[in-house]
Amino acid sequence: MPDILTLYIAFWIFIIGLCIGSFLNVVILRGLSKESIVFPPSKCPKCQHALIWWHNIPLLSYILLRGKCYFCHEKISPQYFIVELLTGILFTGIFFKFGISISMLLMLIIFSLFIVMTVTDLKEKVIFDIHSILLVIFGLVLSLVNHNLQNSIIGILEGVLIMELFASIGYLFVKSRAFGVGDTFIAGGLGAIFGWYPLLFVLLLSLIVQAVITLPLYLKKLYKAKEFKTIISLALFLIITACYKLFTMNKDISMLIIYVGTILVVVSGLYCVRQVTRNIKSATDAIILPFGPAMFIAASIFIFLN
């Protein structure tokens, strides 16, 4: 159990995180609107009225104002509250994970970039080059601190090559890239942070996260279009794969069952892919969600659980 001093430091790390989160909101919104992050002073995005000092207190202002502008009474985006709270929580988690160290400081910066890039990607599907460059730079600095620079450089190249390969696969189905160029830069940045070997697990976890988010939306779309054959093929593939995994966990299982199970998984998977690709005739038919947030979620999970 943490001692009193550790909890005291954690409290102030959380407060600092809230304040940084408030600043990150400014970076996000003014970056998208191409305004200076310094001038003009904070204002309501609806009525443009300059805010009073107590309107800028992280979390508290949103609660006290009940999520509305003090002047025009229009609703304030919950993004302000969510980003501030998330930053505070992540900063505190990083403190408990790394302690007071150079690695902690670098991770605070890296996670700040994660948050900014996630929100801009979700809001406008935009990844600014400067943020990608900073991610690579601080990833390399972190690798220097951990005496692992060569591994980091290989990770950058690996991340870029893998994402470009995946992006090219999109041309086979929807005549366009499967992922944006920004996602390639993100993968390069994650390669700088993790190195080449852990990056493979992070990218695999990213695909799982993306699938978990996208699958319900895709199934809903198929249901509305009455594409029941595709829904059934997806369900069969998932059921067969789950049963195969359960059976192969038994060490006494015969090789015949393993071979038959493997064939069933492959056949059901190919049939599932065939049905899905038949329903995706163009990029507009596909459910396209930004992949950057999935990579950042996967990276965060890997960092905190590793």
Task: State where each predicted segment sits.
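A membrane-topology feature that recognizes alpha-helical transmembrane segments
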Residues: 1-306
